[in-house]
């Protein structure tokens, strides 16, 4: 095993920034072979704390690499808190054998990795899991049949149902999953610095492809034949089909024993699935906590890490089970989600008005959609877009293919907490049409900022 000086220095600096206990030193053994039941060998790195009394063992499994400095600092932070940490590359990624197929193999591969973990002389007898996005999905895969020695999990911004993520609106989430597939397809080329730069440039890279008709040849050239799942996803528009059932891990929500901390952001692409995870686990009586910040899928990482460490050391478990950030306000501690709230009903009126009274009959509001000038995606719960999250959407609201309905100036501040519902009577000339509804906050100067979609 060798010391990773850069990872340790980065972990120490991040530890200090987050106000966590002083980081211990650690050593790293890289590219350890881990056998799977079908003969494939997956590679893992082991971060070993230099202490006689380790805090425990953590397992992380994901497709995004092990060698990049951000990954090493992230894992090193936990090792610096005294944990043995195993970071494994899922099959077909970064030296692990087999083919990467999102959602497939993770249940069996996770179980086989735990079997290997039990055989290691340094294993502490119990382990926990942590990780975000796909590293949260692999945790849920392991929780389909929770190992007896898995004591707790911290699942951050993770789906349990890929079909729902890709097709839940009735149309394919093209920008999100073409972008994600592109990043996965080429992430291994050029080292970790180029990987970061490629990720930052993804929205710009995607733009000409998304504007090309027909899309198929342009998308195929972008992906370079490296993502066979992408075309299969396009061919499976029913999220409840057997295909998607085989890639999902919703069974974990019926089986896991907990305890679990779920972390998401109001503008995270998988926020709705995290809230569903919380509701289903709470309904079963599982010990589950929830943290919701003002984050997108790509932000809030350091705060989520701090929440994870506090959960693992027991202090977060002793606090209120639900912590949410009211955007523009304070963090609130709650006993449950959603909290008791007063329902408000607003009605669309002719003349672009939004009022609490029902409208009299009137002419319908209409707009014309031009496929040559599609309505852009601006802000919101996007996965890889550079324009995700809270954003000034004033120009979007002023487009001729967008209808707006606005309240009078509100006499007092209103906290919007809960799930909004929209009942809309509509018809279109073209049966192949999608409608998108957004709630935005209009400032006194007329500028509009999205709240939720």
Provide a role label for each language-model segment.
Residues 2, 201-204, 210-213, 291-293, ...:
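C-terminal, loop-rich substrate-recognition/catalytic regions characterized by aromatic stacking residues
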Residues 80, 144-255:
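Accessory cap/linker subdomain of secreted extracellular hydrolases
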